[in-house]
Amino acid sequence: MRGILIAIEGVNRVGKSTQAMRLKKALECMDYNAVCIRFPNPDTTTGDLILQVLNKMIEMSSEQLHKLFTKHCSEFVAEIAALLKLNFIVIVDRYIWSGLAYAQADGITIETKNIFKPDYTFFLSSKKPLNEKPLTLQRLFETKEKQETIFTNFTIIMNDVPKNRLCIIPATLNKEIIHTMILTKTIKVFDNNSCLNYIKMYDDKYLNVQELNLFDFEWQKCIEDNNDKEEYDDDDFII
């Protein structure tokens, strides 16, 4: 038995953070253990550095930036693993899908080792931000052309996500409707899959959550190859 990892993805400013926090609060009100992790995370050195680059406060090469984001995601593997062991619903506001979509927009291939594949992904679909910033206030990647390229990359990436692990929601829908859809589906995913012991890594290895020792916390020892993990076959994942 373990918790689940839920990703909320999409281009900039389509309501991801709003929906992620609303989901966390709604789950807590229903007595579920829930936590929301934002990427980039401003409370970490790496996340703060990434945000400074995105806000054009400091400069960094595109390759360095994308590799730094992937490193940033991998920094949370131990924390996410512990939360799953403790039966939390872990909500990530952006995750590896963003890393891939944004890196591909710059023609860069990134390393994805030591990163989980989300159990379920909500993709808020929109080619452009719902509220455009003035040009002088735009972050890196927030030009219309760049966001459209990133959206195209997202659609390609989402096509490779198993359909029983993905919900595509038009970002222009009423916020209450989006929230209800995300909350209802998240609860169903959690309740129907609480018997799972493993979570898939991006390199198709598995972390045995039940074997994780919260005393010494050497999660690397719990990584296993893909050897007949029938209980975690994508076709058997229930929604």
Curated annotation (Swiss-Prot):
Instruction: Identify the InterPro entries for this entry.
Output: P-loop_NTPase, Thymidylate_kin-like_dom
What task does this protein carry out? Catalyzes the conversion of dTMP to dTDP.
Source taxon at top rank? Viruses
Q: Which GO terms describe its biological process?
A: dTDP biosynthetic process; dTTP biosynthetic process; dUDP biosynthetic process
Check the record and name the PANTHER family matching this protein. Answer: THYMIDYLATE KINASE (PTHR10344), UMP-CMP KINASE 2, MITOCHONDRIAL (PTHR10344:SF4)
Q: What is its EC number?
A: 2.7.4.9
For whether the record's keyword set contains Ribosomal protein, the answer is: no
Q: Pfam families this protein is in?
A: Thymidylate_kin
GO molecular function terms attached to this record: ATP binding; dTMP kinase activity
Q: In which pathway does it act?
A: Pyrimidine metabolism; dTTP biosynthesis
The protein's enzyme class: transferase
Annotated residues for binding of ATP: G10, V11, N12, R13, V14, G15, K16, S17
- Asked whether the keyword Membrane is assigned, the reply is no
Give the protein family.
Answer: Belongs to the thymidylate kinase family.
In Swiss-Prot or TrEMBL terms, this protein is called: Thymidylate kinase
